A protein has these predicted regions:
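Phosphate- and other anionic-substrate recognition elements at nucleic-acid/protein interfaces
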Residues: 1-171
């Protein structure tokens, strides 16, 4: 797991850097934060015992993130409503996509044929993103965190923060 540093600043001044939070939704959810340069800042997997515990934790997850300008989610749309409620209150754009959206952009057709192959490929690509972002290599990487990393990569490309998939990550 990467260091959980949520405060990112622009080098030229003291304004918060734009950030994008990607979430693989579930009671075991993956989280990945990207900076305005399109690089991964941190990632993690969090487990919540039930929906009530998740709902209570959302404020604590979002509050320390400086410059949060977008939340991109994939997965359980009912759980997405919990995140969206706070995002709407704080006027942070929030979007929910299907897995097929980021998989189509980032994975080869043959890697999309089964969920298991897609998850294995996501793990490999997420590790490449971690390395490209100059973060320490994980000893283990949960599939929800790996998928959040790729959801976020899709998001920063869509936001125009990156022109495309970095060569170090491309398949």
């Amino acid at each position: 797991m990467a260091a959980d540093q949520t405060s990112t600043r622009n080098e030229d001044d003291d304004t918060p850097e734009e950030t994008l939070l990607a979430i693989d939704l579930g009671l075991r959810c993956g989280l990945a934060l990207y900076g305005g340069d399109g690089r991964l800042r941190w990632y993690r997997s969090s487990h919540f015992a039930n929906r009530a515990q998740l709902k209570k934790a959302i404020y604590g997850i979002l509050r320390p993130i400086d410059g949060l300008s977008m939340i991109l989610m994939e997965g359980d749309r009912e759980l997405a409503t919990f995140w969206r409620k706070l995002a709407d209150k704080w006027e942070i754009p929030c979007k929910t996509i299907g897995a097929e959206v980021w998989r189509e952009q980032l994975l080869l057709k043959r890697e999309q044929t089964s969920g298991q192959v897609a998850k294995e490929t996501a793990d490999q690509m997420a590790r490449a993103v971690i390395s490209w972002s100059d973060l320490p290599s994980p000893t283990s990487l949960r599939h929800d965190a790996a998928e959040a990393i790729l959801i976020g990569l899709h998001g920063v490309i869509e936001q125009g923060w990156l022109e495309g998939v970095p060569d170090a990550v491309a398949r």
